[in-house]
Amino acid sequence: MWVLVWLSFIDNRFEHYQLGVFGTEAHCNKAKARAEVMVKNVGQAVACFAVDRN
C-alpha cells in the first residue's frame, strides 16, 4: 500500500495531510505529479510512502 501526503515545515510548524492511498507505487507517483501544484515553497513537499500492513 502506498500513501500520498503533503508535508509542510514553515516557521518551526509542521503540518501534514494524507491525500490518498494507492495499491501501487506507479499509481501513487501519478497522483503525486498532479499534487505538485500544492507545493508553494521550499518548506513544502508531496511524497509517496510505502506502508506495510503486516
Question: What are the language-model segments listed below?
Answer:
Residues H16-G20, R34-N54:
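Short, mixed-charge low-complexity intrinsically disordered segments
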Residues T24-K32:
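Short amphipathic alpha-helices within nucleic acid-binding modules
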Residues M1, F14-Y17:
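Short, surface-exposed coil-to-beta transition loops
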Residues M1-S8:
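A short beta-strand micro-motif
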